Amino acid sequence: MVKIKKTKGMRKQIRLNEVEEINLLKQWIESQKPDSGFNPLSLRPLPKDSKIGKSEDGKNGTVFSRYAGVRKFAQLPISDKTKRGLKDAKYVDMTDVQSAAIPHALCGRDILGAARTGSGKTLAFVIPILEKLHRERWSPEDGVGCIIISPTRELAAQTFGVLNKVGKFHKFSAGLLIGGREGVDVEKERVHEMNILVCAPGRLLQHMDETPNFECPQLQILILDEADRVLDSAFKGQLDPIISQLPKHRQTLLFSATQTKKVKDLARLSLRDPEYISVHAEAVTATPTSLMQTVMIVPVEKKLDMLWSFIKTHLNSRILVFLSTKKQVKFVHEAFNKLRPGIPLKSLHGKMSQEKRMGVYSQFIERQSVLFCTDVLARGLDFDKAVDWVVQVDCPEDVASYIHRVGRTARFYTQGKSLLFLTPSEEKMIEKLQEAKVPIKLIKANNQKLQEVSRLLAALLVKYPDLQGVAQRAFITYLRSIHKRRDKEIFDVSKLSIENFSASLGLPMTPRIRFTNLKTKKKGVYESSIAMEIENAQEYEAPLVVKKDLLGEDLEEEDFALKPRKEGKVVEKSTKEEEVLIPGNRVLKNKKLKINLHRPFGSRVVLDEEGNSLAPLASVAAEAGTEVALDEERMNDYYKKVGAEMRKADIEDKKVDKERRREKRMKQKIKRKRGAMEDEEEEEEEDHDGSGSSDDETGRNSKRAKKIVSDNEENGGKINTDSLSVADLEEMALKFITQ
């Protein structure tokens, strides 16, 4: 296809058409905007034969079609460029959340939207972004007009891809700012020219702090994707500084599957009369109806057996497995990978580099495999190919976490299945899920198909010693995650069979764990923390000293909370211990005595012939009754005698040292002389080869060389300085000097 070169007149006509289109869209939006608080879903869709947009009526003049409650993107008051992008991306029909949110967003209102996972929330804010900047005729010279904040890098990258698909016919510049990759300097150079920024909170704050003159005074719209997670305390230290640098007069859109309505959170964002859009609030279920959800009661020591058996019986499926900590992910992935279940295994967690995470993510999409992951994949991600199973080996922290996890399957009305493992002490989680309108069914395991993997893991730990440290960290971090959970009705470490759980990981001995109460001096409150001790049968019972070279390079603060973070004043340990979870049930060595740090220094003990201790100077004391008095004459004689011995020894030491240094200098001088002679010989050989030097010079050099060459031919004609005496070395050095 040949491109037609646009003339000046054509470009002018295009600008006029854009201005005319923008004016038409503004009139359309203003004339048919829904009332605040109105639910567009309560209206019926427009008839198929109804006219869209502007029309002329003889009685009322110019009228516009209604766009609230429509079900197709073509019926919205949006630009032709956006419609073309939607059509190329094969987006035709609108979902419920899109139909409810977009009409209010086009009017410039703040929105607080909640909808099920996989319901199309991304398009619900991407379209208003493009239209807002299009109506304002935004250009790269205007700077940043929109910021989209996502809690994870993968979700930000996915949103950036959708934005590029739909907005490819617009001329806006967009940038993706996420951590874990190189190119920060390049970002600093170009971030000022971006109109739309899709970013993670940490990277955006880094540019606000480090990039010169990076400001957003003309920001038009702010988007928080997975808003309940972004507003969580984990991102508070990053989000609050970001919000403080943004203008208050802006449009703000918040979207998530589980939304917050806390006044404090809304006040932080300066929302102005937001529209609360909860599409599925009145629905019978809180999860997609096409999702089949099951739960099994599995003891903690049987979880890996059950997981292994499940994988072996579903080799032709795409399975997403959630675990509590990244240490568990690492151990289960490495151990199962060595056992070769017959299906590709992948792992993904937050500490991996961004390139590696995206590579694993792409590989999981391409083929049927098992992906072990943490909650880093629990939110927002839309896999191009449907996930068949979501398996939650560990109980989620709350109902919201469960909904986000199972939301990775059964997206956009596709079929999906989920399986949740609960220990007997976590059965109350079923009641909480049912209260939240989650239709979950309790099933029993088929013990005939259960394959025990604990013995295989024990053999692996013997064969691969490095894997034992990974297993220990997985054991400890899992118990720590349970201990840190707030809902103590469900999560109780004391109700778990710790020794059996340790054996199920293949560990020969159970790591020792102790829980203590920590009191913060500044706040005056008790904080629960976990102190851990790992000991072998040969070791004495003492607190664990955490060092990276002992437990591996990947030991991180979040895995071992031995000490709380110090904020201002020192955090003191309470003398009272809650409990010792695992008592020492094996013979240990006696405790080593500690050195008394407060002992007096410089003390001296003198013993007599019978072994009794005396005063240091008692040997020179005068024998005069019971009183101890010093004999000055004997003391002076003693000092003179000792002084004479020291002076004599000092003279001998000086002689020995002088002789040693003299020999060292001689050896160095001989080496230097020998090196100089060899250099001269090489130069003479080169002169002889190149210009025919005289025989006299060659003879003199050969005679001189004979003088420094030893007669011992076994050494190859080299001087053996180690076998020569000092006198020989002096004589040889004197000859060299006279020459």
Curated annotation (Swiss-Prot):
It comes from the Eukaryota. GO terms for cellular component: nucleolus. Its EC number is 3.6.4.13. Residues 102-277 form the Helicase ATP-binding domain. Disulfide bonds: none annotated. It holds the Pfam family Helicase_C. A motif (Q motif) lies at residues 71-99. Residues 656-725 are annotated as: Disordered. Belongs to the DEAD box helicase family. DDX10/DBP4 subfamily. The Q motif is unique to and characteristic of the DEAD box family of RNA helicases and controls ATP binding and hydrolysis. This is DEAD-box ATP-dependent RNA helicase 32.
